[in-house]
């Protein structure tokens, strides 16, 4: 009993327990850093410091650069390497329809009523329930769309039925509304993978916090760099390249070195749809996420394609 009591005292000292829940900690940190920025004073956090790792003389991976560029609540001259815990600004958020109801409940629990103004774009999908439009889906999905529409998200189905339901899957829509390689995307689906920026699949609570605060907290993952050489044959589809990557990785290492890491592709000439084919496959390889660095000309072409698709969405209401 004494041993258990001593263990309990350790847990009581944890911040989220002292605060009465994780939401209080998240909002407390956000308010504190925001107040210091407005008042132009140095941040002296009342909270326990996050784990910060900096290796002198070591360069930065693409994901480390993205995380440092979007980091919140750290000093300007501090640069972090993989393994560091960091709060980051989230640019794009996706909520999918099977977990969306839980996300809406989380938002209600934290008394959030409108999407964070720092989020560039957010989408509530209807693609998972669209194929099985049973009585439960017919009851829950319109209610979910009404809530998310009012909250400030683009919704796959219009609560007022003034436009046709969108059949595009969540990943494709998020790809189209992501505009640059420096974006951080959070989506309520394990296959949240983007052709631009770096995207992470997340639980309903993390999605809710990203929508409400425009931020997420996570460790900076380690990376594995993938380099392509030569020219793809005319008879080949890009999916052949994807399968060849897996085969070569297993032949070279004998084990799945992608698991839990970021896969970085520095080819630069992959258009959005090809890049998505690759990044979507990385979910099957149990990678944490994937990054496809684009050359400027390639990024412009991808954005033109995305612009046409978004225009179709606008034209349909």
Residue ranges and their predicted role:
Residues 1-7, 11:
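Single conserved hydrophobic/aromatic residue that forms the stacking wall/gate
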Residues 30, 35, 67-74, 110-115, ...:
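Structural signal for hydrophobic packing residues in well-ordered secondary-structure cores
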Residues 12-20, 24-44, 182, 186-299:
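Mobile "lid/hinge" segments at catalytic clefts and subdomain interfaces of large enzymes
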Residues 81-219:
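Long, structured ligand/cofactor-binding scaffold of large enzymes
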Residues 43, 75-83, 116-120, 154-162, ...:
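Flexible, glycine/charged-enriched surface loops at secondary-structure junctions
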Residues 9-12, 16-17, 303-317:
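Phosphate/diphosphate-binding glycine-rich loops and adjacent basic-rich segments that engage nucleotide
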């Amino acid at each position: 009993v004494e041993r258990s009591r001593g263990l309990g005292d350790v847990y009581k000292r944890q911040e989220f327990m002292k605060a009465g829940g994780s939401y209080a900690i998240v909002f407390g940190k956000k308010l504190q850093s925001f107040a210091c920025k407005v008042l132009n004073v140095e941040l002296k956090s009342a909270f326990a410091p996050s784990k910060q790792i900096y290796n002198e003389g070591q360069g930065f991976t693409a994901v480390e650069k993205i995380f440092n560029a979007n980091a919140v609540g750290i000093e300007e001259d501090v640069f972090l390497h993989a393994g560091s815990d960091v709060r980051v600004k989230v640019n794009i958020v996706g909520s999918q329809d099977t977990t969306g109801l839980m996300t809406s409940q989380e938002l209600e629990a934290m008394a959030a009523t409108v999407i964070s103004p720092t989020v560039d774009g957010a989408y509530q999908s209807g693609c998972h329930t669209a194929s099985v439009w049973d009585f439960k889906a017919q009851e829950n999905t319109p209610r979910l769309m009404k809530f998310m529409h009012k909250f400030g998200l683009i919704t796959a189905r219009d609560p007022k039925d003034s436009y046709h339901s969108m059949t595009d899957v969540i990943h494709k829509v998020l790809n189209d509304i992501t505009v640059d390689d420096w974006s951080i995307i959070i989506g309520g689906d394990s296959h949240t993978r983007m052709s631009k920026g770096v995207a992470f699949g997340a639980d309903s609570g993390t999605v809710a916090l990203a929508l409400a605060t425009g931020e997420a907290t996570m460790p900076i993952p380690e990376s594995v760099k993938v380099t392509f050489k030569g020219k793809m044959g005319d008879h080949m589809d890009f999916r052949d390249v994807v399968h060849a990557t897996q085969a070569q990785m297993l032949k070279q290492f004998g084990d799945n070195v992608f698991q839990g890491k970021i896969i970085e592709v520095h080819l630069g000439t992959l258009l959005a749809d090809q890049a998505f084919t690759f990044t979507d496959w990385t979910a099957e390889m149990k990678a944490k996420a994937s990054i496809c660095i684009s050359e400027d000309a390639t990024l412009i072409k991808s954005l033109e394609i995305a612009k046409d698709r978004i225009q179709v969405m606008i034209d349909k209401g």
